[in-house]
Amino acid sequence: MDRLLQFRFESAPGWQSNVALFLLSIGGLFTACKLFSFCRALLSIFVLPGQKLSKFGPKGSWALVTGASDGIGKEYSLQLARAGYNILLVSRTTSKLAAVADEIKSKSPTVQTKVFAMDFFKNNDGDYENLKLLIQDLDISILVNNVGRSHSIPTPFVLTPLEELENIIMINCTGTLRITQLVAPGMMQRKRGLILTMASFAGMIPTPLLATYCGSKAFLQYWSIALGAELQPYGVQVELVQSHLVTSAMSKIRRPTVTVPIPRDLVRAVLSKIGRGSGLSAYAYTSVPYWSHGLMAYALTQVLGHMGKFVLGYNKALHESIRKRALRKAEREKNKKST
């Protein structure tokens, strides 16, 4: 018995030491992985350049931009024209498209422009057939899927008008898919091309009171990743561009801040960081090119947990507050009209 007790007493320190070493190794490996991920995000956001646009097509080839009449789409058109690409502008209102085309010609005189007016909500087969005829002889190197629609104000799902639900899904999802299906085959034949699809943090973070909009953007996230894997063997690069708020008609924000850039700065970041994941390097075929958005995406996915109750609760409270302010404003305007 004394020998048995002595054996147990002597073996304990060795057993504890092995467990401690194992736990320290696991902890060290976890810390090293987190540190590597953080450093990679910082390098991608602030230091490393993106791929050159010339990889996807020469100057003089075409870029097709949807939702091109204002905001982010207009800025893509201007900056891609400045880079030497001819621009095919697609949106709903002919007069607005013509104004953007005139601005492009004044700033980039050597660039050609074409305009094509269509209402994505109508999902008219004739519109898509006419657009197909228009692009069949064009060397389209870059497609920017920018057309989009959100809710008029944050609204509980059960109170959202049916027309608004259909509008969001038809424009954000169906329109994007049909345009891409027209353009991608030509890119595959030429063995080069770039497809940029504008997403939103709302598609990455569940957003109460914007449920349908955030669902449509989440759809684009998974669709883009799958499409990217399909088209990569053909030399076509797919990139989903994640962003937080931007000053625009859709966001109804007019004043830029550190986390809310103007469209020009966002687009400049996108075109300079092609192929860089920035704060979302764990997501294939996805980027968050604007620096503050990249840091936010990293914090949300790696620290706070973007699907957790804390972020969900904050998002819900934020949009409930926005809804209350919007309803009060609408009531004030209604009272002004009645007096």
Curated annotation (Swiss-Prot):
Entry keyword annotation includes Repeat:
no
Does the record carry NADP as a key word?
Answer: yes
Checking SUPFAM superfamilies in the record gives:
NAD(P)-binding Rossmann-fold domains
Entry's EC annotation: 1.1.1.330
Q: Which reaction does it catalyse?
A: a very-long-chain (3R)-3-hydroxyacyl-CoA + NADP(+) = a very-long-chain 3-oxoacyl-CoA + NADPH + H(+)
Task: Say where the protein is mainly found.
Answer: endoplasmic reticulum
Location within or outside the cell = Endoplasmic reticulum membrane
Enzyme's top EC category = oxidoreductase
Q: Which residue spans traverse the membrane?
A: 19-39
Pathway assigned in UniProt? Lipid metabolism; fatty acid biosynthesis
State one Pfam family annotation: adh_short
GO CC annotations on file: endoplasmic reticulum membrane
Q: Which GO terms describe its biological process?
A: fatty acid elongation; secondary metabolite biosynthetic process
An MF annotation (GO) of this entry: ketoreductase activity
Q: Which family does it belong to?
A: Belongs to the short-chain dehydrogenases/reductases (SDR) family.
Which PANTHER family is this protein grouped with?
HYDROXYSTEROID DEHYDROGENASE-LIKE PROTEIN 1, VERY-LONG-CHAIN 3-OXOOACYL-COA REDUCTASE
Instruction: Please name the HAMAP family in this protein's record.
Output: 3_ketoreductase (MF_03107)
Q: What is this protein called?
A: Very-long-chain 3-oxoacyl-CoA reductase
Native source organism of the sequence: Ajellomyces capsulatus (strain NAm1 / WU24) (Darling's disease fungus)
